[in-house]
Amino acid sequence: MLVFLHAVFITVLILLLIGRLQLLERLLLNHSFNLKTVNDFNILYRSLAETRLLKVVLRVIFLVLLGFCCYRLLVTLM
């Protein structure tokens, strides 16, 4: 039961992190209007690529933990 609660807690934290990363991505895109040099665009491009990669990794971890939670719940109910 403790393992199940721990997995649920981490799943919720991952969802919150994904939401924060989406907010960060929107803020970075809003600041693209203020960029003046090519170096600024390169930094923005790298930052957006890193946030997108991090979102993908967190979503994969989220799906694995969600599957684990569902499996543990089914085992507990049987």
Curated annotation (Swiss-Prot):
Where does the signal peptide begin and end?
Answer: 1-23
Q: How does it sit in the membrane?
A: Single-pass membrane protein
- Tell me the keywords, alphabetical order: Host membrane, Membrane, Signal, Transmembrane, Transmembrane helix
One cellular-component annotation, GO: membrane
In terms of domain of life, where is this protein from?
A: Viruses
Localisation per UniProt entry: Host membrane
| Ranges where the record places region Interaction with PPP1CC/PP1-gamma | 59-65
> So where does this one cross the membrane?
58-78
Chief localization: host cell
- Please give the residue ranges for the topological domain Lumenal: 24-57
Assembly notes: Interacts with serine/threonine-protein phosphatase PPP1CC/PP1-gamma; this interaction; this interaction probably promotes EIF2S1/eIF-2alpha dephosphorylation.
What family is this protein classified in? Answer: Belongs to the coronaviruses ns7/ns7a protein family.
Which purpose does this protein serve, as stated in its record? Inhibits the integrated stress response (ISR) in the infected cell by promoting EIF2S1/eIF-2alpha dephosphorylation. Acts as a functional homolog of host PPP1R15A/GADD34 to recruit PP1 phosphatase and dephosphorylate host EIF2S1/eIF-2alpha. May function in the formation of membrane-bound replication complexes or in the assembly of the virus.
- According to UniProt, the name of this protein is Non-structural protein 7
